[in-house]
Swiss-Prot record:
Name recorded for this polypeptide: Ribulose bisphosphate carboxylase large chain
Annotated source species: Chloranthus spicatus (Chulantree)
CC terms in the record's Gene Ontology section: chloroplast
Record note on quaternary structure: Heterohexadecamer of 8 large chains and 8 small chains; disulfide-linked. The disulfide link is formed within the large subunit homodimers.
Keyword Iron-sulfur in record: no
Amino acid sequence: MSPQTETKASVGFKAGVKEYKLNYYTPDYETKDTDILAAFRLTPQPGVPPEEAGAAVAAESSTGTWTTVWTDGLTSLDRYKGRCYHIEPVAGEENQYIAYVAYPLDLFEEGSVTNMFTSIVGNVFGFKALRALRLEDLRIPPAYTKTFQGPPHGIQVERDKLNKYGRPLLGCTIKPKLGLSAKNYGRAVYECLRGGLDFTKDDENVNSQPFMRWRDRFVFCAEALYKAQAETGEIKGHYLNATAGTCEEMIKRAVFARELGVPIVMHDYLTGGFTANTSLAHYCRDNGLLLHIHRAMHAVIDRQKNHGIHFRVLAKALRMSGGDHIHAGTVVGKLEGERDITLGFVDLLRDDFIEKDRSRGLYFTQDWVSLPGVLPVASGGIHVWHMPALTEIFGDDSVLQFGGGTLGHPWGNAPGAVANRVALEACVQARNEGRDLAREGNEVIREASKWSPELAAACEIWKEIKFEFEAMDTV
């Protein structure tokens, strides 16, 4: 460069490749209350030091790139860069480390889960220096949390809308999930709600297919829940899946649901995307609709222990983006969930303040300030014999959802719903009387079945059903 063309920005600039750890590994850094903190599980490639791998993650998910660039001189990298401030080995694992990274808040757009994830996990997971990478947890500071609306309504407002207190809510996914006509689908909804359930549900892939267009389904389901409400005197709901190919179509379906006067709609938040989900959550708050969230596709992202994103992070993101319910596994059914880990992210969904607890997979203390809570939904391979454990594990602020465990009853849908409602009421009463559901649960169910033939039939048909596989999601 000639003296005539030299600029201030180029003074001191030296082209070339530097080790990431020279700028992005800062073990003396004291985190700020406004930083977003991340815990990554690193598996470096052979020969790559963990400090270099952690620094690479911090760099590539913030301001860094593979080489020095002269435009670094036009900004303050020290203000905007991510910092790997601590690394620790994972006990019992070879060549695995937890790297803690702090991100300045100014790196992120306010109220945008999409931008947060694009920055933190958007590019770095394909980095060649890493054999595998998993985002285990995030600490979202109150300063960022306050830029989000969060759930449309939250737990207390939902209970007030439904006028239901002191017990878990009961639901059922209509089966078969695909192939029914809209009228037959509505019939199944009516039978389940009449039998005592609070909610029925579209499955995640029920959108608007040739055998059942969305508008027909919405109309027949609305008719079913109004009829069930008139007969039972209870407020009922059906999760009408508004997920669609475009945001405009999704909102159109939510508008029609509101015009029908139903209380709740549904969205597949991972396949639909965070931008669409946040838009729908805002519409639901403005128009008095509850929002049920299905986590379809989550296992693609969260199931591998050393690569991907843990579901506790996806759960935190959902609370920020917005949803009143979200599926959270069961611990006891067919879908995976180890007890302590599951209860860790269940607390992250419901509570205002959650302490750091590594035994439950919680790497950071999380303060949600005023963000409303989300009801966890337990579903997948559960039936009446699981009711005591589910009541004890999840407590009152939850939705217990029995699909096959309702529709598979030998006498039909309504008796299946009756069996589940009787089992739940018996467990809640036993708990309130001080009985130990973990130890006496089966006895409680047997006692209740003596005066409920529907429950007795359900107990008989599902007495041998078990899903005994080792959980992969462990600390």
